[in-house]
Amino acid sequence: MNKEKELIDKLIDLAFAEDIGDGDHTTLSCIPATAMGKSNLLIKEAGVLAGIEVAKEIFNRFDPTMKVEVFINDGTEVEPGDVAMLVEGKVQSLLQTERLMLNVMQRMSGIATMTRKYAKKLEGTRTHVLDTRKTTPGMRILEKMAVKIGGGVNHRIGLFDMILLKDNHVDFAGGIDKAITRAKEYCKEKGKDLKIEIEVRNFDELQQVLDLGGVDRIMFDNFTPEMTKKAVEMVAGKYETESSGGITFDTLRDYAECGVDFISVGALTHSVKGLDMSFKAC
């Protein structure tokens, strides 16, 4: 079992335990165990669909006898009135899986919709939009999947798959040179093949990084577009570049036109609105 599926399965199991507890007594009290039925996933708002594959796993994990017919795949732009899938099986199973499936699909589709909007604004530039670790606890893997479905690029998944030396790391380590040197020594000692990124707050710190080297990417933190343009010129293609901090949808293109490789946007995941949809008997 790969790590991604393992995390998703754990999330599904936890969500069912949280929601159902010792039983869905509403359903169990009024729906016969033998009753069979069908439900449609109805789209009620324009956006980008995401989470279909996870929804299939939710149904299968709860009741492998449920049958799912998919009409619209992940990444497709949808409109109100579209029917994304049909699910057939025991009515008790349909009712007990409905809320978890909708919670996941609405959240993922909202993120994919937001990401697509940002990605489209970057068309014609070299810049890609990145997500961050500003995610819902326990749902990061799904939210980062949604970013990719929407056309964005995942930054590191967690603290384990990349070294990102932020301002606090630099300050606690005693400066940029010590932070980079220790990070490189750590990777060598531990046999870790990890990319190293460092955040800089001004041109002095940027010049220190350029003089020392030893990193893969430089993040410009809270730079203005004018500062970013100069910073990109200073880096001169030697390292990947990333803009972060205070960048809005309205200013996104201004930063991209400075020539940065990536722009990280926490808003893709931390404050997104779910896409409206419903799961109705048919």
What are the functions of these language-model segments?
Residues 1-212, 217, 226-234, 239-242, ...:
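Acidic/glycine-rich phosphate/pyrophosphate-binding loops and surrounding catalytic core
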Residues 221-222, 245, 267-268:
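Short secondary-structure boundary segments
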Residues 249:
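Cys/His-rich Zn2+-binding cysteine-cluster or related metal-binding knuckle/ribbon modules and their
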Residues 278-282:
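Active-site loop ensemble at the mouth of alpha/beta enzyme cores that anchors a bound cofactor
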